[in-house]
Swiss-Prot record:
Matching Pfam families: Trp_DMAT
Organism classification: Eukaryota, Fungi, Dikarya, Ascomycota, Pezizomycotina
Family named by the database record: Belongs to the tryptophan dimethylallyltransferase family.
Phenotype when the gene is knocked out: Impairs the production of the xanthones variecoxanthone A, emericellin, shamixanthone and epishamixanthone; and accumulates several upstream metabolites, including emodin, chrysophanol and monodictyphenone.
Protein name: Xanthone prenyltransferase B
Keyword set, alphabetical order: Transferase
Function: Dehydrogenase involved in the conversion of monodictyphenone to the prenyl xanthones such as emericellin, shamixanthone and epishamixanthone. Monodictyphenone is first converted to variecoxanthone A via a paeciloxanthone intermediate by the consecutive actions of the FAD-dependent monooxygenase mdpD and the xanthone prenyltransferase xptB. Variecoxanthone A is further prenylated to emericellin by xptA before being reduced to shamixanthone and epishamixanthone by the dehydrogenase xptC.
Gene Ontology biological process terms from the UniProt entry: alkaloid metabolic process
Pathway: Secondary metabolite biosynthesis
Gene for this chain: xptB
Entry superkingdom: Eukaryota
Mechanisms controlling activity: Mn(2+) and Co(2+) strongly enhance prenylation activity.
GO molecular function list: prenyltransferase activity
CDD domains reported for this sequence: PT-DMATS_CymD
EC number, UniProt record: 2.5.1.-
């Protein structure tokens, strides 16, 4: 891997590289809140600390981010995984192994800095019961608290979609879950994105209508959108693509996210799953079937994206645009019960279309599932860093690699895949590729559970 190159930032990793000074200070001074909360804090709190340090956040911002986690993440992750424990009553669908937490690392452009984000599905004590069949109570509590804690927060759009993407007869949801023999499944997620001078709050909605099968149908989505904004040129363009284009007809809508800020500045991201990973399909979707004009800059961006995907998957230079990227069964994951009615969600690429009012055409991002198509986590990391370094963006590559090794302290990165889940790309107006790596802490990985020490005191470096 490339050298760090961060001459202005003195990193604060403790001896052995398993935590940072900020995390150790907070862990020693903040009060215990019970075994489950403490366990999640020791796991994901330490991971967050290492990522913030690797991304060279100022020390005061590191403390701020960790305190957000302490107050608004760790207490809401449900029962902590333990070796030999019964499976949790509510199993999150945020990750394949049931971990209700996700990290992302937005890669720096030349001369810039990375951004770190976390997302989670809050799990309340009554999740899946007749009192809270959709597991919404914890999320509503957190949003109420964060609306005061995050400057500039505005929940207007979140309130609208909470009211229109779900039914409100909890008794019928309880009956449906009993008929299914399992809980309804994940429907609300939130994320905090930590920029250097601000923090952004987003809400994600996975609709769960009573008459819904695997995916909510397009007319039901549109009914919700129309209640917010009757006319939207970007949304009209997406609908035309979905109904007339061969690739568009294959897309399945499964999620929506909104920025919880002033509606004048917020985005509405509509997420779809595609069964394809071939680059011709990626190009067709990211141009909206030719509706987004081809330019010299965009042509170069597509060439760069294809080169990047061939690099991380270790495919040869003349790999055809029409070929699906080969599937690599290396992560040990299988279809968990909550995905039984939507197995397509575990393969193919994911896209979002930003359909916020004021745009004639949507901004589009593709999420490539590296967990399915790359040899192992070390290969993904090394190949991505090599690509970034060759384009003057490798300043943080080595620090990112070391952070991943710390997070995966229960195994070696070269042993398997699955820690890194997606690599996303959005084309920027300046010609750069906006890239983000997403990863799963794998809290329920058998190796992590057996790796735990038999006894430990709160605040130790390792969970």
């Amino acid at each position: 891997m490339a050298t760090d190159g961060m001459v202005l930032h003195k990193r604060s990793l403790s001896e052995g590289g398993t935590s940072t000074q900020a995390w150790k200070v907070l862990s020693q001074t903040l009060p215990s809140r019970g075994p489950d909360v403490d366990a999640w804090w020791q796991l994901t709190g330490r991971h967050l600390a290492v990522l913030l340090d690797a991304a060279a956040y100022p020390i005061e911002k590191q403390y701020e981010c960790l305190l957000y986690h302490y107050h608004y993440a760790a207490p809401y992750l449900g029962p902590a995984p333990r070796e030999g424990a019964s499976p949790p009553t509510w199993k999150s669908m945020l990750q394949l192994d049931g971990t209700p937490f996700e990290f992302s690392w937005k890669w720096n452009n030349p001369g810039g800095e990375p951004d770190v984000r976390f997302g989670l599905e809050p799990i309340g004590p009554m999740a899946g019961t007749s009192l809270d069949p959709l597991n919404h109570l914890a999320m509503r509590e957190i949003l109420y608290k964060l609306s005061s804690a995050v400057p500039g927060s505005d929940l207007t759009w979140t309130h609208h979609f909470l009211a229109t993407l779900f039914d409100h007869d909890y008794a019928k949801y309880t009956q449906k879950a009993a008929t299914m023999g399992s809980s309804i499944g994940t429907s609300l997620v939130y994320s905090l994105e930590f920029q250097r001078k601000s923090t952004g709050l987003k809400t994600y909605f996975h609709p769960r209508k009573l008459d819904q099968q695997a995916f909510l149908d397009i007319p039901s989505w549109e009914a919700s959108f129309r209640g917010l904004h009757p006319n939207s040129p970007s949304r009209t363009a997406v609908h035309e693509f979905l109904s007339t284009n061969p690739e568009g007809k294959l897309l399945k809508p499964f999620c929506l996210s909104v920025d919880n800020c002033s509606p004048a500045k917020a985005r509405i991201k509509w997420y779809f799953n595609s069964p394809h990973t071939n680059f011709r399909a990626i190009r067709e979707i990211m141009t909206l079937g030719g509706r987004i004009a081809d330019t010299e800059t965009r042509t170069k961006q597509f060439s760069e994206l294809f080169n990047l995907l061939k690099t991380v998957t270790e495919e040869h230079a003349d790999f055809p645009e029409t070929s699906e990227f080969p599937y690599v069964p290396n992560n040990g994951d299988s279809i968990i019960p909550n995905f039984a009615d939507a197995p397509d969600m575990l393969k193919g690429c994911v896209y979002f279309f930003d359909i916020a009012p004021g745009r004639n055409l949507p901004a589009i991002k593709v999420y490539f599932p590296v967990r399915n198509h790359c040899r192992n986590d070390l290969a993904v990391t090394q190949n991505l860093n090599r690509w970034l370094e060759s384009r003057g963006r490798g300043q943080y590559g080595a620090a990112f690699g070391r952070a991943l090794e710390t997070i995966a302290d229960y195994r070696r990165l070269e042993d398997s895949g699955g820690l890194l889940s997606f690599l996303s790309c959005q084309f920027m107006e300046d010609g750069e590729l906006d890239l983000t790596s997403y990863f799963n802490p794998q809290a329920f990985h058998s190796g992590r559970l057996t790796h735990r020490r038999a006894t430990r005191r709160r605040g130790d470096d390792r969970w």
